[in-house]
Amino acid sequence: MERAEHIYQKLVAICGEENVLRDEPMKHHTLVRIGGKADFLVWPETYEQVVDVLRLKEEYELPFTLLGNGSNVIIRDGGLRGIVMQLKHLNRIWREGNNIIAQSGADIKAVSRFALEQHLTGLEFACGIPGSVGGAIMMNAGAYGGEVKDVLDHVKVATLTGELKTLTNEELELGYRTSLISRTHDIVLEVVFALQPGDYGQIKAKMDDLTFQRESKQPLEYPSVGSVFKRPPGYFAGKLIQDSGLQGKGFGGAEVSTKHAGFIINKNNATAADYIATIEMVRKTVKEKFGVELELEVKILGEE
């Protein structure tokens, strides 16, 4: 039996045939609708399956990529080698006291809505963030003055070798769009958010206002990765790009949004090469005009 088939059969034995795909085009699994093929895409249904896949990866010395819901990532056209794991089945959300516990694959927007239903305040800022809970922890996601760091109590993670452990807010070293696990690549399994009782009407009004701001300013009618660049100290990335005259410009099917210059949209079947070339054009032009280096907020993965 060839090695790839052997690995496939082992993955099927762990996760079930319906949860293992071979040579899967990743453009179907990223919000920007871009990306080459993954050798193996797996969707574990339990923490035990996550650990078993990690141990298999170790045994066969396979490359490994954990993907959230594909919101903040560009996968190159050559795709991803080895195993790609998504935790979309691990999506439970529940309440214990004033804490909300969410599994890594849950949508952070769904957790924000659940908090509203439970009359708990603290997660309003997340009502429009397009991402999984695990991804939100890794990036210390934030919007409109709030961030994960403000409400996170602790997380359960699996290390890349399959060891389970708990990390507190302090141990996670949460900073602006970064965390300890963005460097260690530990896999978030479960998250505890510490919230406060609040007034349903006030919580809903704040979420409605943030949703309106987002929908009126962001180009949600086209696929994109969301905000491409981090906020440079003392500036706004979108304003620098706008003042550089780059809106409506790009390569191939990728284009700097005319609605919000901080977004690059997939306007017409863009490839990853189109998208990355557009990013580099923006960075180069802003550096030349304003002397400001734009840092990426998105992750670029895979082979060219």
Curated annotation (Swiss-Prot):
EC id: 1.3.1.98
What sequence ranges are listed for the domain FAD-binding PCMH-type?
34-198
Report the Pfam families cross-referenced here: FAD_binding_4, MurB_C
What keyword terms does UniProt attach to this protein? Cell cycle, Cell division, Cell shape, Cell wall biogenesis/degradation, Cytoplasm, FAD, Flavoprotein, NADP, Oxidoreductase, Peptidoglycan synthesis
Q: Which GO terms describe its cellular component?
A: cytosol
Known InterPro entries for this protein?
A: FAD-bd_PCMH (IPR016166), FAD-bd_PCMH-like_sf (IPR036318), FAD-bd_PCMH_sub1 (IPR016167), FAD-bd_PCMH_sub2 (IPR016169), MurB (IPR003170), MurB_C (IPR011601), MurB_C_sf (IPR036635), Oxid_FAD_bind_N (IPR006094)
Needed co-factor(s) = FAD
Q: What is its main location?
A: cytoplasm
Q: Which GO terms describe its molecular function?
A: FAD binding; UDP-N-acetylmuramate dehydrogenase activity
Q: Where in the cell is it found?
A: Cytoplasm
Q: What class of enzyme is it?
A: oxidoreductase
- Any GO BP annotation: cell division
Organism superkingdom: Bacteria
Catalysis: reaction(s):
UDP-N-acetyl-alpha-D-muramate + NADP(+) = UDP-N-acetyl-3-O-(1-carboxyvinyl)-alpha-D-glucosamine + NADPH + H(+)
The record's annotation in NCBIfam families points to: murB, PRK13905.1
Q: Which family does it belong to?
A: Belongs to the MurB family.
| Protein purpose | Cell wall formation.
Q: What is this protein called?
A: UDP-N-acetylenolpyruvoylglucosamine reductase
According to its UniProt entry, this protein's organism is Geobacillus thermodenitrificans (strain NG80-2)
